[in-house]
């Protein structure tokens, strides 16, 4: 019967961890991230849900003769903000799986 108490304790611990993970995920999703490129000439903002909320382009980088450069800057700023979200998510959620030997995590 000792094993049942252990199992109940483990289940409670898992439920607590699930609640903490859900809160951490909600906090991440509500957070706003900012990516930049060209020394701040292009800024892209996104939520933790990876929804782009704002793009700011400094007029100095708008050259009708070189649209490709502007496209590259927007792409770089977007990739920067997405990487920040990914890194923050991995760091935050990694705390929950640290020490667990779960395949695929």
Curated annotation (Swiss-Prot):
Provide ranges: composition bias, Low complexity: 1-16
Tell me where it mainly resides. Answer: cytoplasm
The cellular component terms of Gene Ontology attached to this UniProt record, alphabetical and capped at eight, are: bacterial nucleoid; cytosol
Region feature Disordered, mapped onto this chain: 1-23
Q: Where in the cell is it found?
A: Cytoplasm, Nucleoid
Q: Which GO terms describe its molecular function?
A: DNA binding
User: Is Zinc-finger included in the keywords of this UniProt record?
Assistant: no
Q: Does the keyword Nucleotide-binding apply?
A: no
Question: Which Pfam family, just one, is annotated for this protein?
Answer: YbaB_DNA_bd
What keywords tag this UniProt record?
Answer: Cytoplasm, DNA-binding
Known partners and oligomeric status? Homodimer.
Protein family membership: Belongs to the YbaB/EbfC family.
**Record PANTHER family:** NUCLEOID-ASSOCIATED PROTEIN YBAB
Protein's job: Binds to DNA and alters its conformation. May be involved in regulation of gene expression, nucleoid organization and DNA protection.
The record ties this protein, via NCBIfam families, to: DNA_YbaB_EbfC
Q: What is this protein called?
A: Nucleoid-associated protein lmo2703
Q: Which organism is it from?
A: Listeria monocytogenes serovar 1/2a (strain ATCC BAA-679 / EGD-e)
């Amino acid at each position: 019967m000792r094993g049942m108490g252990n199992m109940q304790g483990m289940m409670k611990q898992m439920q607590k961890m699930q609640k903490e993970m859900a809160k951490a995920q909600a906090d991440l999703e509500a957070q706003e991230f900012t990516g930049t490129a060209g020394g701040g000439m292009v800024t892209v903002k996104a939520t933790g849900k990876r929804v782009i909320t704002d793009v700011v382009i400094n007029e100095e980088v708008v050259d009708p003769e070189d649209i490709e450069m502007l496209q590259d800057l927007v792409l770089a700023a977007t990739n920067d903000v997405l990487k920040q979200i990914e890194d923050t998510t991995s760091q935050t959620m990694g705390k929950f799986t640290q020490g667990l030997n779960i395949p695929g995590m």
